[in-house]
Amino acid sequence: MAELDPFGVPAGGPALGNGVAGEEDPAAAFLAQQESEIAGIENDEAFAILDGGAPGSQPHGEPPGIPDAVDGVTNGDYYQESNGPTDSYAAISQVDRLQSEPESIRKWREEQTERLEALDANSRKQEAEWKEKAIKELDEWYARQDEQLQKTKANNRVADEAFYKQPFADVIGYVTNINHPCYSLEQAAEEAFVNDIEESSPGTEWERVARLCDFNPKSSKQAKDVSRMRSVLISLKQAPLVH
């Protein structure tokens, strides 16, 4: 019976097909060992993928679990993605740190608030002063207007008294004050007749009389027939009597 080595291979080496024991090839044994090791590594990676997911590539010099510099910045604030309780606590502490303001910023904010409140109080005070001043000036303006109106009325009364002391004041007053409620066409005609008398020339008497008459038959509102009188006045105007 042939002796066996520790690996169960006959000491004389493997027997060939013709029953002759051959020597082991070192190169073939080395290649077989390398293939076995490679197969073992591939099997380990396959089990790791099934257990924990696909392994991600990490940048050189960065340990696993640190997020990318671009993905970890939002609006200028650094945050950590949480995949577990530890990351959640870290995110909460990060938010607390962002919410807590520095002492200088807090002091500046308080000073700004006090300054704005002072400006608002000053604006309200100035507004009240301006309103009071405007009311006072308006009252003074009304007083001046009333005083000026009273003076104007007094001056008008004095002027009227002096005017009506003149000769023919009634006639002149009616004509010169056209907007006066007592003004009438008859009074204007009377004034014109008086002026014609003062500036009359011989032979124009009947012409001045004709100017005082209305020779339009349609505009006459009188019930009496004055057609004969109109014809006489027209004839005298055209051919006045010679004294």
Curated annotation (Swiss-Prot):
One of its GO terms (biological process) is cell division. The modification N6-acetyllysine is found at K218, K237. GO terms for molecular function: clathrin heavy chain binding; structural molecule activity. The modification Blocked amino end (Met) is found at M1. Residues 1-22, 49-87 are annotated as: Disordered. The keyword DNA-binding does not apply. GO terms for cellular component: clathrin coat of coated pit; clathrin coat of trans-Golgi network vesicle; clathrin complex; clathrin vesicle coat; endosome; lysosome; plasma membrane; spindle. Residues 10-20 have a biased composition (Gly residues). Keywords: Acetylation, Calcium, Cell cycle, Cell division, Coated pit, Cytoplasm, Cytoplasmic vesicle, Cytoskeleton, Membrane, Mitosis, Phosphoprotein. Clathrin is the major protein of the polyhedral coat of coated pits and vesicles. Acts as a component of the TACC3/ch-TOG/clathrin complex proposed to contribute to stabilization of kinetochore fibers of the mitotic spindle by acting as inter-microtubule bridge. PANTHER family: CLATHRIN LIGHT CHAIN (PTHR10639), CLATHRIN LIGHT CHAIN A (PTHR10639:SF1). Clathrin coats are formed from molecules containing 3 heavy chains and 3 light chains. Interacts with CALY; the interaction stimulates clathrin self-assembly and clathrin-mediated endocytosis. Interacts with CKAP5 and TACC3 forming the TACC3/ch-TOG/clathrin complex located at spindle inter-microtubules bridges; the complex implicates clathrin triskelions. This is Clathrin light chain A. It comes from Bos taurus (Bovine).
